[in-house]
Amino acid sequence: MSDAKLQSVLSSLSQVARQLDALPSDTPAPDSSWVKLNTNENPFPLPEIIMQSAIAALERQYLYPEDDNISLREAAANAYSVSMDQVIAGNGSSELLGLVYRAFLTPGDSVAMMSPGFSFNRKLATLQGAQFVEIEFSKDHSLPMEQLLFGPAKDAKFILLANPNNPTGTFVPVADIERLVAKSDRLIVLDEAYVDFAPENGLRLINRYSNLLVLRTFSKSYAAAGVRVGFGFGHPEIIGRLRNIQNVFNMNVIGQAVGISVLAHRAAYADNHRHIRHERRRVTLALSQLGFSVIPSHANFLLARVPTAQDGSWWQSAFARQKILVAVFPDKGLENYIRVSIGTKEQMDAFLRAASRISRILNMSTPPR
């Protein structure tokens, strides 16, 4: 295609598509020699019994997957003690988030989200032509109830809350979330992507409140980011509306098989989760000793304020020169922070060596006062 033809094609892009060019995206690892700590995957392989289910599913790859994910939804209903009509299964929880935006928003509507938050939601709002209302957490990381109920968020079609929050890793007690759900007449979308690393979850609330939708993913705690498995739990009427607009055959046979097997063998991940919690504590202490200010985390990552005048982006580049990827964010107030995923002990040792090396070089180059 000639440049002139390409420009003609690109000029036909919608205004929405052009707006998306300005939104940030994750940095992929150039090759396997890099230490990838920027997207919060679980670093361990699937347990062998679950891997076998994936291999067995490949024998059925010439057939379409089960439509409407009936067997997977039934397995989730049994595992989480809910009814099958309270469950929707998706190609990761990101697909389910997209369904919520499509189902509830039209151009000109607004959605409210706690800030700082998962940047993908800005993209979803833009795709729907919706306004994005960001509500800051209170200084102690609690929910600002007045603002959510009566302030800038009062006209939003729904309120999105991640718990634990990304990118801070902070956790709001479920009792506080219940107070918000009880007092609000709008849909509250509770994204619990990281909840398996937290002290409690809010799933039980869906049987008390019809305006709550809880999202889960197997990408973080269950090491299945590559096969894309997610769930939504809520009132059957809301779940039914979301399933109505879901694509046919939205999950592949491997994702369905792995999802069912994970649900049957969640206990196989106990050591995995213990390791991540242990490394989270160890790295928090080590970073603190290097002068970083680390926000206490209930997720599989840490958000840390860098200890020097250089900002987070500078540190990100310094780590990249040592083949280590960490995340930074454009959000107001996060310019001097980096986020690091919790990986294997070997990965975290490499990260800490790099952090120590960078700090030492900076200290050597700082003139005495």
Curated annotation (Swiss-Prot):
The Gene Ontology terms for molecular function here are: histidinol-phosphate transaminase activity; pyridoxal phosphate binding
Enzyme Commission no: 2.6.1.9
CDD domains linked: AAT_like
Keyword hit for Transferase = yes
Q: Which GO terms describe its biological process?
A: L-histidine biosynthetic process
Q: How does it assemble?
A: Homodimer.
What is this protein's record name?
Histidinol-phosphate aminotransferase 3
Read off the lineage from the record. Bacteria, Pseudomonadati, Pseudomonadota, Alphaproteobacteria, Hyphomicrobiales
